[in-house]
Design a protein with these regions (language model features):
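Bacterial N-terminal signal peptides that target proteins for export
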Residues: 4-15, 19-33
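Acidic/polar, low-complexity intrinsically disordered N-terminal segments immediately downstream
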Residues: 5, 50-156, 160, 164-167, ...
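N-terminal export/membrane-targeting signals
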Residues: 32-40
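C-terminal motif of bacterial Sec signal peptides marking the signal peptidase cleavage site
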Residues: 43-46
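Charged, low-complexity interaction regions
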Residues: 76-83, 107-110, 198-202, 230-233, ...
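Long, amphipathic, charge-rich alpha-helical segments that form helical bundles/coiled-coils
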Residues: 121-135, 154, 169, 189, ...
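Extended amphipathic alpha-helical interaction segments
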Residues: 166-307
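A cross-kingdom marker for long, charged
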Residues: 248, 252-258, 262-275, 299-365
């Protein structure tokens, strides 16, 4: 059984990390611009640093960090509450130590000190990876941990911006899908992207107009997702990424407020990820997968919200999207299709896949 579990871990990891994913599974996954925005728009949102630790020297700071590592090594078990508490403690301790060393220019003057900090930091990450195996974490646990350890958790300024943007996205739900076949939808989708690139996006109104029109196309596309397995969609993915990148460039140039670009585009991405995930669940519950490749692609798209919704994006979840996420969480353990895909007992899949998702999150901390 242990050998089979180890094999499953490798299979799950390969599925998650594989670059041989059909382009359709990445249509919704245009997060590169969000990472660009994180770098070039630092004034949009920020969390304050609270240096609660008082160091007398760089050696003192490193000893504190080493002591925290020792406390983690002593932990033999964990649960969701403990994991969240320790992850937040790690972040605050790491930030405080790092900022102290940076202020003292230690990283520039002492390579040995920099190497020690990195070694301790990597060892702490290893201990958190170990802790993922000390409790049977569920999909709900993974979501809770991501929510409660986000640096934007309880950020009132961000929540205010989300509340301001929410009516725009709620209104999109009332717009009907296109009543046409997949060929027509793909043709119209490509035309929208081409026209948008030609026109350009230079104002908030331009951005919202694009998000609204794109939303109709994307939801219409998802209605035919099951029959898109043979379609080449790389051009749609590339054009979408190009437009998103241009939106953030416009924000950098001051044409669109940085806050608006970050919040609306983040909410757009979260919305698409969850729409894609729920559409796949509906298909996989009601239709027979045409091939193992299609089944793997569906699994990849279903778990994408757990992987791709980052610390900023998860803080923009609306109540409706949290409900959608709960639906995904409730459906994943029920479907025997997933267990069949990985050829293993369903109970094992129900805690091993969440474990791997949690490990992936730890690697981003």
């Amino acid at each position: 059984m242990k050998k089979r579990i180890q094999t499953l871990k490798l299979q799950i990891t390969h599925c998650i990390l594989s670059h041989e994913i059909d382009a359709k599974s990445m249509l919704h996954h245009t997060l590169l611009p969000l990472f660009i925005a994180w770098i070039v728009l630092p004034t949009c949102m920020s969390c304050s640093d609270d240096d609660t630790l008082d160091f007398q020297s760089s050696e003192d700071a490193l000893k504190v960090y080493q002591t925290y590592l020792g406390s983690l090594k002593d932990m033999k078990t964990s649960n969701t509450a403990i994991f969240c508490k320790e992850a937040n403690t790690w972040r605050s301790t790491s930030d405080t130590v790092f900022h102290y060393l940076m202020r003292d220019s230690v990283f520039l003057k002492d390579n040995n000190c920099a190497e020690r900090f990195t070694a301790i930091h990597d060892s702490i990450r290893f201990e958190f990876l170990r802790l993922t195996e000390t409790w049977r974490y569920s999909y709900e646990d993974v979501l809770k941990i991501k929510e409660q350890t986000s640096v934007f958790h309880d950020d009132k300024e961000l929540q205010g911006a989300v509340n301001e943007a929410q009516p725009f996205f709620l209104k999109l739900d009332s717009i009907p899908l296109l009543e046409s076949g997949k060929a027509s939808i793909l043709r119209n989708y490509r035309k929208l992207l081409k026209d948008t690139k030609l026109k350009g996006i230079n104002t908030k109104s331009d951005m919202l107009e694009f998000i609204g029109k794109e939303d109709i196309m994307f939801r219409s596309f998802l209605a035919h997702l099951y029959d898109m397995d043979k379609e080449s969609l790389a051009d749609i993915t590339q054009e979408t990424e190009s437009i998103c990148r241009n939106i953030f460039i416009a924000a950098k140039e001051g044409k669109i407020k940085a806050r608006d670009a970050m919040v609306y585009m983040s909410m757009r991405t979260v919305r698409r990820l969850l729409q894609n995930s729920t559409a796949c669940i509906s298909d996989i519950n009601h239709q027979q997968m045409k091939s193992k490749a299609q089944g793997n692609a569906y699994l990849w798209m279903i778990i994408q919200p757990f992987i791709s919704i980052d610390q900023f994006s998860i803080a923009t979840l609306t109540p409706q999207e949290r409900s959608q996420f709960n639906y995904v969480i409730s459906q994943l353990p029920k479907s025997t299709k997933f267990a069949k895909t990985f050829d293993i007992d369903q109970r094992a899949l129900n805690y091993l896949l969440p474990q791997q998702l949690l490990k992936m999150y730890v690697l981003t901390l």
